A protein has these predicted regions:
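Loop-to-transmembrane-helix entry motif
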Residues: 28-35, 206, 247-253, 257, ...
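Extracytoplasmic/periplasmic domains immediately adjacent to an N-terminal transmembrane anchor
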Residues: 1-196, 366, 391, 397-412
């Protein structure tokens, strides 16, 4: 008899689980706001973000020149600067005020200032200086200015050394100017591009943030549609905590299994980004990450009482989370307090693990720390979800019982 009852309980629980899954799926499909966060944003936002950085690096950044020397050496230096792909000299100004005006008006993004003593110092064998001013509103402009001028100064230094060395052969010139030969090889990001560096981290963050927004919006809708503003409806199918948590999470898992495949596999391929991950490794790593994000979002949704609240609470966190993940800003430079805060979010370990798997060809063994922590987060947030949903079931029952008591009193 006991086994029979247990069998009935399991059977009824399974039926309720799939009933809740189906109801949640219908709620997602019928809610345009949730569809936007679950479908439209994951489909469109990666494309938009990648299109913005599709050129990887900036080329031919316009620059102004103030040449107070006007010698053959200063003109040669400027030719070397202009010959590269990074910078384009668009204006020769008579003084700094004219150059500053161009910079303020946005016609140039940098100024190259050559002092009057430029050629005289070189002739005397005294170190001379070239000053560059850059619009620091864009770090890529600064990078282009610095790279172009550094390369030009190094090349000019070589020419000056050759002229003064008195060597008799080309080989002697090579040895005197470059005694140690080196080769600069960019690994994992051969283009030295911004998209290859930033987009993988953004794709992982989109999964977490859209889940937070979508699940939060769905929770706000459920409360607004409930007579007592409860998250859990009073229904015989919604009596068990596990069936509710697993039923809802199964809906989100099915949706994001498809969305994650699109974002992490198709989008990088469409834009020829670095992608050397093994399919099995990537799938094994993403499974706990998506689960951790789902249960994290379900736990946080308990604080959402209105549909619009999730927009005000979660949207602004995207940029800070990207910074404290240790990708766009060095992890060693992050204050310890914010580093500890970042451990609460699945995106921190998801981003670091995915970048190493996707861009560096790492295996699960190489990202074992991140992989284990994601499973720990999955377990912890699953427990917190069960706790808060159990609390909601209790509140829902209490509100219904209180309402029944009021009705009985009125009838008396």
């Amino acid at each position: 008899m006991r086994a029979y009852k247990l069998k009935d309980i399991i059977s009824q629980g399974t039926k309720d689980l799939f009933y809740i899954w189906w109801q949640e799926l219908k709620a997602v499909v019928k809610d345009q706001g949730v569809l936007i966060f679950f479908i439209l944003v994951p489909l469109g936002y990666p494309l938009l973000y990648t299109f913005i950085y599709t050129n990887e690096t900036v080329r031919e950044v316009p620059a102004a020149v103030v040449d107070n020397n006007r010698s053959s050496l200063s003109r040669e230096y400027l030719r070397l600067v202009d010959a590269g792909a990074d910078l384009e000299i668009v204006s020769h100004c008579s003084d700094m005020e004219e150059a500053k005006t161009l910079l303020k008006n946005g016609k140039v993004y940098g100024i190259i200032y050559i002092p009057e003593s430029f050629s005289r110092d070189i002739t005397k064998g005294v170190q001379t200086h070239v000053t560059i001013y850059c619009d620091m509103s864009g770090m890529l402009y600064y990078k282009a200015m610095l790279t172009a001028n550094t390369n030009a100064s190094l090349m000019m230094n070589k020419q000056i050394k050759i002229e003064r060395s008195g060597n008799t052969t080309i080989r002697q010139d090579e040895v005197s100017t470059s005694p140690i030969a080196y080769e600069d090889i960019s690994i994992f990001n051969p283009q030295n591009g911004f998209a290859s560096f930033l987009i993988p981290a953004v794709l992982i963050l989109i999964i977490q943030q859209t889940l937070l927004l979508g699940v939060g919006l769905s929770a706000g809708t459920a409360r607004e549609n409930n007579r007592f503003r409860d998250l859990i409806p009073m229904s015989r199918h919604y009596h068990g905590t596990l069936r509710i948590v697993l039923g809802k999470s199964l809906t989100y898992l099915m949706i994001y299994a498809v969305m994650a495949t699109y974002m992490l596999c198709l989008v990088p391929k469409m834009f020829s980004l670095v992608q050397i991950a093994q399919a099995g490794t990537l799938a094994a790593f993403m499974f706990p990450y998506i689960l951790a994000c789902i249960f994290f979002a379900m736990t946080c949704s308990i604080f959402i009482h209105h549909r619009e609240a999730c927009m005000m609470i979660y949207v602004f966190t995207s940029v800070p989370l990207l910074f404290i993940s240790g990708i766009s800003w060095p992890g060693t430079a992050i204050p310890k307090f914010w580093e500890v805060i970042s451990w609460l979010f699945p995106s921190t370990f998801g981003i670091n693990g995915f970048v190493r798997i996707n861009n560096m060809g790492a295996t699960l063994t190489d990202v074992l720390t991140e992989y284990r922590i994601l499973w720990i987060q999955t377990g912890v947030y699953f427990l917190t979800t069960c706790i808060v949903y159990r609390r909601q079931i209790t509140l829902s029952r209490r509100h219904v019982y209180e309402r029944l008591k009021e009705i009985k009193k009125r009838r008396r």
